[in-house]
Design a protein with these regions (language model features):
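Phosphate/adenylate-binding glycine loop and adjacent helical scaffold
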Residues: 1-212
C-alpha cells in the first residue's frame, strides 16, 4: 500500500512501490522514479459515478498515479491533513479532497441545507474503506471530537470534513439580539450530534447566510 507523509505542512509525499493512488487532477508538483498518470472520469467512479456527479453538481476531476518512487502533491499552498480510515466513511467537500489510496471507494451523498448554506451544492463526497486520504484546508485544520454528551456547533464556512456516526442539523443563529446589533453575526451553524470527529479550518468560506 502507498505510504502517505507530509513534506512540511503544504506538500504531500506519497511513496509507491508499484502501488496506485487517486489524486486531484493537476495536483502533482514533482516526482522521482517511474510514474504513470491517467485521468479518470466521474471522480474515478466509472460511468455511473460520472452521471451521478453531473446530476448532483458535486464535480471532482481525479487522476490515477501509479509507479515506483515518490510523488509530491499540493493544491494552491493549502494546508494538508492526513486521515487514516479503518473501514469507516469520510465526508468531505470535493474541493478539499487531495489524494486517496486507490483502494478507497468514493461516492456522493445528500447533505441538504447544510451544503447550500456553505455555498456548495446539496451533495458532498464520501470516501470509504481502509487506507489513507489527504484533505486540504485554508490554514491548519483543528480536529474536534463530538460525543453524545457534547454536541458541536460549527460555522458552515469553516467546516472541512467529518468522520464517525454523526447527525447534522442546520440551525439558525438569528435571534432578537442579532437584530439589535448585539448578536454574533453568524446567521447559521451546523450542529453535529453523535460520536465522531469534525475537521474545522481557521478561515471561513463565503456562505449563503453570510453575516446578518
Amino acid at each position: 500500500m502507498a505510504q502517505f507523509r507530509l513534506q512540511g505542512s503544504k506538500v504531500l509525499a506519497v511513496d509507491m512501490t508499484g502501488d496506485a493512488v487517486k489524486a486531484k487532477n493537476g495536483a502533482m508538483v514533482a516526482y522521482d522514479g517511474q510514474m504513470a498518470f491517467k485521468k479518470m472520469s466521474g471522480g474515478g467512479e466509472g460511468l455511473r459515478g460520472m452521471v451521478t456527479r453531473r446530476l448532483t453538481g458535486e464535480q471532482m476531476t481525479v487522476m490515477e498515479v501509479k509507479g515506483h518512487g515518490t510523488c509530491y502533491f499540493a493544491d494552491r499552498a493549502s494546508e494538508i491533513n492526513l486521515v487514516q480510515l479503518q473501514g469507516e466513511k469520510l465526508f468531505v467537500e470535493a474541493g478539499n479532497l487531495l489524494c486517496t489510496d486507490a483502494a478507497l471507494r468514493t461516492g456522493t451523498t445528500f447533505t441538504g441545507l447544510r451544503g447550500a448554506s456553505q455555498g456548495n451544492g446539496l451533495f458532498t463526497t464520501t470516501v470509504e474503506g481502509s487506507g489513507q486520504a489527504a484533505i486540504t484546508s485554508h490554514g491548519p485544520a483543528v480536529v474536534l471530537r463530538v460525543t453524545k454528551q457534547y454536541p458541536l456547533q460549527v460555522d458552515p464556512g469553516a467546516y472541512v470534513a467529518h468522520t464517525g456516526d454523526l447527525k447534522q442539523h442546520l440551525q439558525s443563529g438569528v435571534n432578537f439580539r442579532t437584530f439589535i446589533g448585539e448578536g454574533s453575526g453568524e446567521a447559521f451553524q451546523i450542529r453535529f450530534e453523535g460520536e465522531g470527529l469534525v475537521y474545522v479550518q481557521p478561515s471561513e468560506r463565503n456562505t449563503v447566510g453570510g453575516e446578518v
